[in-house]
């Protein structure tokens, strides 16, 4: 039902190409996952998403628990049927919301007490509840409940979050009993190498079908993220997928892949699209700028997505300036396609034996700009 095969390795880096088999289809790695927090990738329909080449998306346990509630989703036949997406889905456990909504919660060893931001009611999220919600949602991959510490944080605070995350992982494993759903553990440790290494050892000891590196992209410098990945990735089991949470820039993706990471997610492509920004050749173009008013070329002349095939920079500029919703959708479609295309190009380079020359280390003026 769930398996992972490594099909090709780079001879000079840790980069690899693999295939993750799930009940709803295969995921070819390295793979970028668009974020569909509430069961929708903002502004993009499932059909449009499929045409970008996306193979798996991420949804969020915490937000779906609040609205519409896992009972409604379960009654509909599970999250895939509820949202009309018949491809793999990974659900995050809600641990990141412990970090991002810190003023609204109280954390102890039992779990997290939330004040519902919608109606002010008091809610509790524990490892057991988080896993039960994910089993009801019916995702292909569930994430263990974890505590994501903020940045910066003291050594003692991060150590406490690590110990709690490891305890919550044990409890998540104990309650999880859905045979057609894989459970991944999450490594924490902030920017402290010794805590990261210890967390990697502990989480790896549970022999799970996949492991994520969490607690990144919470405000720390990009170089710190790359340092964490270099430290942690070699400690992880070889034969399972490795998932770096919350990463989406081309440089970070390439560095992570060179260190043996397989899966990624980030809200960046759709967030930028909703603000009128397009990703083109690793750069960010603000389509509001007057320079695009009379520019009748495709948005990205090297891209074959529906946006670039059918629409010009001038038209997109017009839509954004006119505050037409279609403009935000078209930019989001392109931005997702941009990241999917980049990860696929890295996979081809690994198979062709030229990844280290083309992508690692990825530089803004490197050949990577011209080969994918």
From Swiss-Prot:
It is an enzyme of class 2 (transferase). Zn(2+) binds at residues 303, 305, 308, 334. SUPFAM superfamilies: tRNA-guanine transglycosylase. It comes from the Bacteria. Residues 246-252, 270-274 are annotated as: RNA binding. Keywords: Glycosyltransferase, Metal-binding, Queuosine biosynthesis, Transferase, tRNA processing, Zinc. This is Queuine tRNA-ribosyltransferase. It comes from Prochlorococcus marinus (strain MIT 9211).
